[in-house]
A protein has these predicted regions:
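Generic, low-specificity signal for short hydrophobic/alpha-helical stretches with a mild N-terminal bias
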Residues: 1-4, 27-35, 42-47, 114, ...
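Helix-loop junctions and short alpha-helical segments
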Residues: 49, 61-165
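Short, well-ordered alpha-helical segments
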Residues: 47, 51, 205-208
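Charged alpha-helical initiation segments
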Residues: 1-47, 59-66, 70-81
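Polyanionic, low-complexity intrinsically disordered segments
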Residues: 1-25, 144-231
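Secondary-structure capping and boundary motifs in well-ordered enzyme cores
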Residues: 41, 45, 49, 172, ...
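General alpha-helical segment detector with a strong preference for membrane-spanning helices
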Residues: 58-59, 188
């Protein structure tokens, strides 16, 4: 099946068009704004671009598991990594509790091999309901740093996300992302950052390109394991 854009990507692109349009409108010389005011608006679009990328990651992950649930996927149709991460996350909180209180009775009860809620992700025949919490997968890794993207996409089974994006797009997307985040961090720390509309346009073009490759890599991964209907 040919690639189709995720809902998360469509929302990102709609927001990007609005932001670039705003930056373009205030960039003209006849607009009655000072250089400082224009620069603040340009900076704001960069910060909002980063927020839009965060939102893409959140919506993409949450939509994926919503699709699994609404279409009654079996556990076997879900990639192994999110199932394993879910089990690890639940067990980790149990072990952390044991480290604090050394209550062996409680940990044996909670880790009991008959605990269906804990080990349900192991049973490939079950129908997916709420076995995996999508927020648990994405919430602590949605800030789009290269490190977070590597971890987040590994959680859904893509072990080397930048290898995939670089293969598809024939360029170094991790470097592209770092370059954008350098600008965003400079703005966040209120350091002097003079931007032009061309700077804004270039950053939006680069991040939209990155997101295109993230979306395509994810599409191929989900379709190969789960099937196109869950996209």
């Amino acid at each position: 099946m040919p690639y189709s854009r995720s809902r998360a990507r469509q929302e990102f692109e709609n927001k990007s068009v609005e932001l670039v349009s705003l930056a373009r409108q205030i960039s003209y010389k006849n607009v009655a704004l000072s250089y400082e005011h224009k620069n603040l608006i340009f900076q704001s679009t960069i910060v909002l671009l980063c927020s839009s990328l965060e939102e893409y990651l959140r919506v993409f992950i949450e939509d994926l598991f919503f699709n699994y649930k609404s279409l009654s996927a079996t556990i076997s149709e879900i990639p192994v990594n999110p199932r394993t991460f879910s089990l690890f996350h639940k067990q980790r909180t149990i072990y952390e509790g044991f480290i604090n209180n050394r209550d062996e009775f409680k940990i044996l009860d909670r880790l009991n091999i008959t605990n269906q809620r804990l080990y349900s992700v192991v049973d490939s025949t079950q129908t997916f309901v709420d076995h995996i919490d999508s927020k648990m997968i994405v919430n602590d890794k949605k800030y789009p740093s290269p490190k977070n993207l590597k971890i987040l996409f590994n959680r859904i089974g893509i072990k080397s996300i930048f290898n995939e994006t670089d293969r598809i797009g024939k360029k170094n997307y991790e470097l592209l992302l770092r370059s954008f985040l350098d600008v965003r961090e400079t703005i966040a720390h209120q350091e002097s950052t003079d931007l032009t509309f061309n700077d804004v346009k270039r950053n939006f073009k680069n991040i939209t390109d990155l997101l295109d490759k993230l979306d395509r890599a994810s599409y191929s991964h989900i379709c190969s394991i789960s099937g196109q209907k869950y996209w």
